[in-house]
């Protein structure tokens, strides 16, 4: 449990930016508000992870289906541009660039869906919990190839305007990411128990 004043003092900033950060972290489920301006740091357990990815899967599969119906030629060009960049990143083994392409590609699909509310909610969720920020580069490289392959299939289906199959492929992609995160967390827990 920490207080707003303690954190502001440690960071040598006013309370305002810390309060705003706390509010965002409370909204995202990382902190819980206590009495007397105190907050409790919540652990990220399996339920939190599953809830996060299930919500993302529901929204992202809808975006994939909507993108099949609403995507313009400009949207397709943007997705192809990002995909080409991700292909080059994978060939070079550049996980930093691939990570950015991963986000950019998902965002391009959300944009092609044409629903501003979904874009906002998914952007907020993406910034809250991302597998690649919690694992090493080597570990991410192992799952990046699978992610890349899934992206190729999702794009193929969106370009073919096959809404039903694109929706299914996106849901599988997101839930596979969930399983990766749960496996990683389980492994981390086992490592800490051995030490």
Positions of PLM-derived features:
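A ubiquitous short alpha-helical element
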Residues: 44-50, 64-72, 89-93, 134-141
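Amphipathic alpha-helical effector-binding/dimerization core
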Residues: 100-103, 112-119
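Alpha-helical structural segments
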Residues: 24, 28-29, 47, 51, ...
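C-terminal all-alpha effector/ligand-binding and dimerization domain
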Residues: 61, 80-87, 92, 104, ...
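Short linear motifs at protein or domain termini
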Residues: 1-65, 69, 178, 182-195
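Amphipathic alpha-helical packing segments from all-alpha helical-bundle domains
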Residues: 96-100, 120, 145
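Short, charge-rich, low-complexity alpha-helical interaction segments
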Residues: 47-50, 118-125
């Amino acid at each position: 449990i920490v207080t707003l004043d303690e954190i502001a003092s440690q960071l040598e900033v006013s309370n305002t930016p810390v309060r705003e950060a706390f509010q965002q972290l409370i909204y995202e489920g990382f902190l819980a508000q206590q009495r007397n301006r105190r907050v409790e740091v919540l652990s990220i357990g399996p339920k939190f992870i599953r809830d996060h990815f299930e919500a993302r899967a529901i929204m992202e599969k809808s975006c994939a289906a909507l993108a099949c119906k609403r995507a313009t030629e400009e949207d397709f060009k943007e997705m192809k541009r990002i995909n080409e960049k991700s292909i080059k990143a994978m060939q070079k083994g550049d996980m930093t660039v691939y990570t950015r392409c991963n986000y950019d590609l998902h965002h391009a699909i959300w944009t092609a869906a044409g629903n501003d509310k979904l874009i906002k909610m998914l952007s907020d969720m993406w910034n809250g919990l991302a597998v690649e920020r919690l694992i090493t580069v080597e570990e991410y490289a192992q799952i990046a190839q699978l992610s890349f392959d899934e992206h190729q299939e999702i794009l193929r289906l969106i370009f073919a305007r096959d809404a039903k199959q694109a929706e299914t492929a996106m849901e599988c992609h997101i839930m596979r990411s969930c399983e990766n995160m749960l496996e990683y967390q389980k492994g981390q827990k086992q490592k800490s128990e051995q030490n």
